[in-house]
Design a protein with these regions (language model features):
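Conserved donor-binding/catalytic core segment of Leloir-type glycosyltransferases
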Residues: 9, 61-77, 83-86, 96-98
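A short helix/loop element that forms part of the nucleotide-sugar donor recognition site in Leloir-type
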Residues: 44-60
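Nucleotide-activated donor-binding/catalytic signature segment of Leloir-type glycosyltransferases, i.e.
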Residues: 108-135
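Short hydrophobic beta-strand element within catalytic cores of glycosyltransferases
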Residues: 169-172, 182
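Short alpha-helical donor nucleotide-sugar binding micro-motif in glycosyltransferases
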Residues: 139-144
Length: 250
């Protein structure tokens, strides 16, 4: 079906390369890139809804820096790498893990043990395993000094757009389509990932977190630039027009 299509849409240039490598007979001129969009009227810098703060319920200290992760517990999302890196975070940094829906019992047990070890080694670890409504996720993203995306692969990484739309700096691996979302040194920090050397990635990730969170002004600049980038380049109106243009040409 893919090779017979008049047009194929990939969500990033990285995904386009992957499609062409899997389907070598596919005409490259028929493979287009249209990135996923973000609704900046849904994702925006926001205080707690109706005064009900999920962070206050968790016991997060608003006077201390905090990094957040939101995602499923899978190998692809790199949660074990983030937990390992957090052992090297500066002691004042808090970590909010909104991580649930493990895809295997094995990784569920692995992450549970790793979080327990981390919490025993240092304070400021908050693990939310249940599903949260958008309003509470928006509160967490908005309050975070930085959002951390340790994925080992992402076609694009919509969660990074959600964090950026909330005016939060992003620290992310440089895999897949992530570099097409996170502008290194402008909206966040990219960390090199090599599957053959995960320990190096974890050390680099910790160093990036410590560096950015020690400079709140830079984190704030990244966050402001990230929201503007979402508005300018990832609005659904912008994405829809790109999609329509492909249909017109076909």
């Amino acid at each position: 079906a893919v090779e017979a299509a008049d047009a194929v849409i990939a969500v990033s240039s990285g995904m386009r390369d992957d499609v062409l490598s899997v389907y070598p007979g596919l005409d490259p001129n028929r493979v287009h890139v249209v990135k996923n969009g973000i609704d900046t009227d849904v994702w925006y810098p926001a205080p707690p809804e109706r005064g009900e703060s999920v962070l206050a319920e968790l016991g997060v200290d608003p006077s201390r820096p905090m990094v957040a992760f939101v995602g499923r517990i899978t190998r692809q999302k790199g949660v074990p790498h983030l937990i390992a890196a957090a052992h090297r975070f500066d002691p004042d940094i808090q970590v909010v893990l909104c991580a649930g829906a493990p895809d295997t019992p094995e990784i569920a047990a692995e992450v549970s043990a790793a979080v327990a070890d981390l919490a025993a080694a240092r304070g400021g670890i908050f693990w939310v395993q249940e599903f949260l409504p958008i309003g509470k996720i928006r509160e967490i993203l908005s309050a975070a000094t930085a959002f951390v995306c340790p994925s080992v692969y992402e076609p694009l990484g919509i969660v990074n757009l959600e964090a950026m739309a909330c005016a939060t700096a992003v620290i992310a691996s440089d895999v897949g389509g992530i570099p097409e979302v996170v502008d290194d040194g402008v909206t966040g920090t990219l960390v090199h990932y090599e599957a053959a050397d995960p320990q190096d990635f974890e050390m680099r990730l910790a160093a990036a977190v410590n560096s950015l969170l020690s400079d709140p002004d830079r984190a704030r600049r990244y966050g402001e630039a990230g929201r503007q980038r979402c508005i300018d380049e990832f609005s659904w109106a912008h994405i829809a027009e790109q999609t329509l243009e492909i249909y017109r040409k076909v």
